[in-house]
Amino acid sequence: MILHAQAKHGKPGLPWLVFLHGFSGDCLEWQEVGEAFADYSRLYVDLPGHGGSAAISVDGFDDVTDLLRKTLVSYNILSFWLVGYSLGGRVAMMAACQGLAGLCGVVVEGGHPGLQNAEQRAERQRSDRQWAQRFRSEPLTAVFADWYQQPVFASLNDDQRRELVVLRSNNNGATLAAMLEATSLAVQPDLRANLSARTFAFYYLCGERDSKFRALAAELAADCHVIPRAGHNAHRENPAGVIASLAQILRF
């Protein structure tokens, strides 16, 4: 079994760019950014429970990494960068720390490196279980209307929130809930030490209005790019800013 993805081919000899979306996104999420890099072959992945991979269920990050690895092999991708937002960023960091043959580097936008104590994990598990129950049992428009009121999305205006609620409500609530629980921050290990000892290139992107993740970025041994005029979802709020940062990263 492999993950559903859309592949776009560029010039031979360059590494692939493999894009991983955030929670409730899909393979379309990164394409405005990715299509600015037409020289590179691009793979836009649907994570388990999402888009064309909605029917794929996993028990945890190890399963996701295994599926990602098999997907890369199926497309004969031998050299690549992982580019991930939020959940996709956490998947990218986990997979990279577990080891992926052919990995050139990782670019993470607003991805959490992991909680640092049992109390934080227990609180996150309670929260994610409550959200998962809502995703399983309530209309998605109602759930996402509340989801985008969370502090991490404080930079969004009302129109942006409404647009995201409509977009995300096309998902399957049950499969979103399953993925939310399987890849909760409550079950993700703290990756700070692994990332400090990494053997791959590592870059971090965060919006200038995303104070939580700017603080987290400062804890990581990573080259951090602050995206102007953007909050947590920087590639949606300022795609040109993310394109500029990614172009700078790929020039090295």
From Swiss-Prot:
Catalyzes a proton abstraction reaction that results in 2,5-elimination of pyruvate from 2-succinyl-5-enolpyruvyl-6-hydroxy-3-cyclohexene-1-carboxylate (SEPHCHC) and the formation of 2-succinyl-6-hydroxy-2,4-cyclohexadiene-1-carboxylate (SHCHC). Belongs to the AB hydrolase superfamily. MenH family. The gene is menH. It is an enzyme of class 4 (lyase). One of its GO terms (molecular function) is 2-succinyl-6-hydroxy-2,4-cyclohexadiene-1-carboxylate synthase activity. Disulfide bonds: none annotated. It comes from Escherichia coli O157:H7. Its EC number is 4.2.99.20. This is 2-succinyl-6-hydroxy-2,4-cyclohexadiene-1-carboxylate synthase. Pathway: Quinol/quinone metabolism; 1,4-dihydroxy-2-naphthoate biosynthesis; 1,4-dihydroxy-2-naphthoate from chorismate: step 3/7; Quinol/quinone metabolism; menaquinone biosynthesis. Monomer. One of its GO terms (biological process) is menaquinone biosynthetic process. The keyword Isomerase does not apply. Signal peptide: none annotated. It catalyses: 5-enolpyruvoyl-6-hydroxy-2-succinyl-cyclohex-3-ene-1-carboxylate = (1R,6R)-6-hydroxy-2-succinyl-cyclohexa-2,4-diene-1-carboxylate + pyruvate. Keywords: Lyase, Menaquinone biosynthesis. It comes from the Bacteria.
